[in-house]
Amino acid sequence: MQALIETFFARKEEYLQALIEHMQLSFISLLFAALIAIPLAIYLTSHRKLAESLLQVTGIFQTIPSLALLGLLIPLIGIGRPPAIVALVIYALFPILQNTYTGLTEIDPSLEEAAEAFGMSKKEKLFKFELQMALPFIISGIRTATVLIIGTATLAALIGAGGLGTFILLGIDRNNLSLIFIGALSSAALAVLFNYGIHWLEKANGRRLIIGGTILGLLLGGSFFWNQQTSSKEKQLTIAGKLGAEPDIIINMYKALIEENSDIQVTLKPNFGKTTFLYNALKSDEIDLYPEFTGTVIETFLKNPPQLDNQPQVVYEAARAGLKKQENLTLLKPMRYENTYAVAVKRSFAKAHQLKTISDLQKISNQLKAGFTLEFIDRQDGYKGLQEKYHLNLNVQSMEPALRYQAINNGEVNVIDAYSTDSELRQYDLVTLEDDQALFPPYQGAPLIKTATLEKYPELAEILNKLAGKISEEEMSEMNYQVNVEGQDPSIVAKDYLKEKNLLK
């Protein structure tokens, strides 16, 4: 409990931002879902054959896995809030549509006949008594949709839309139960709170509706005002990072250097998502800058990657030239360390089987159970390369990055993919095997920025290049250890390093 409280207060500003983002996503999605579903239900009461088909279709929408739906929407809409809102609206349609339709079609026919006898038009019947009588059903549908939206909105963090899911993802990535509890409990509490609020409005009278509408308006308006205030400065730069401690440390270094050496104000978006999300966000102007790796550029982003030897400078020049030509992006000078892919095993396992190189795994391949990330499994410089160059066909389980370390520590797998600067290598007493067939290209970290942004703020090149050739693998691994294992704040770790190297006052 003490750790939970300390984590909460240490991250209270991030928490407030995530809570506001979560509420915005939920409110906007619920509003759009209600504006679509309620009028549609009214229309369907006069077209009952069509109603059955549409209810089945909206019901099918709810069976689509949320991650799959987000994945389908990304190529069409992009990343960030738009696809998250569309997905949440799709999930919320069915309960509101079904309940509204049920409420309107179960009104006593004798009341309908009496209304017609009094000469009421369809519009008059609808607004004078039908909606009033169906209101408990409508509110019930909205309550169900609200709980569904607030819970599902945690997945929005996977595509850079923010929300309380960022705490859950970060907690999983860093094996930090406090962060997971903060995100999960807050989401659950928010769902309960709004469920109660809507239940209070269920017994609606004019006064309650006015109060409820005013509170909702103030919350929405206040949250947007907060966002506007935090992003209203003229010289504003948004820097994002991938999941994990290392990108978090690096972007905090960028922020500290930029704000000390210029009048540009920096907004950070740590744990923004995986590689392709950040790359697409940069191209669509949702972010201005993020740290990327030279090997990733060659293997993932370039449409026609050149065949290169594994010399770091050669790979950097090819990555820089390729991005400039293909997307008009600028890859600034790289840091010294290489956070390359590696194959890791427990030290005791390596000693028992005399493993020093990846090729040594061939002699015990039938005993191996591998835990690889999905990205590693699908990459040419990952498991595909292990199959082609090392002729390794293993029993492979796909895992999230943080979970594979827990799996090898618990003996559930005995070989994993890793990054050479991961703090978990030291934490769990793992060793990396020599890449004796030179499968993995160099992965030097460097700032990736739109050329247009660099033209707008030309001073950024000189500022960010202060890190060029700096940070060894040992130093980066130690900083990762301080954040992941010792629980230090990434911004403090970043500033301490910069001060130690006389890059920051």
From Swiss-Prot:
GO terms for biological process: glycine betaine transport. InterPro entries: ABC_Gly_betaine_transp_sub-bd, ABC_transp_perm/SBD, MetI-like, MetI-like_sf. The keyword Transmembrane helix applies. It is found in: Membrane. GO terms for molecular function: amino acid binding; transmembrane transporter activity. Residues 19-198 form the ABC transmembrane type-1 domain. SUPFAM superfamilies: MetI-like, Periplasmic binding protein-like II. Keywords: Membrane, Transmembrane, Transmembrane helix, Transport. GO terms for cellular component: ATP-binding cassette (ABC) transporter complex. It is a multi-pass membrane protein. The keyword Transmembrane helix applies. Part of an ABC transporter complex required for the uptake of ergothioneine (EGT), a natural low-molecular weight (LMW) thiol antioxidant. Responsible for the translocation of the substrate across the membrane. Also contains a C-terminal periplasmic solute-binding domain (SBD) which binds to EGT with sub-micromolar affinity. This is Probable ergothioneine transporter EgtUBC. It comes from Enterococcus faecalis (strain ATCC 700802 / V583). The gene is egtUBC.
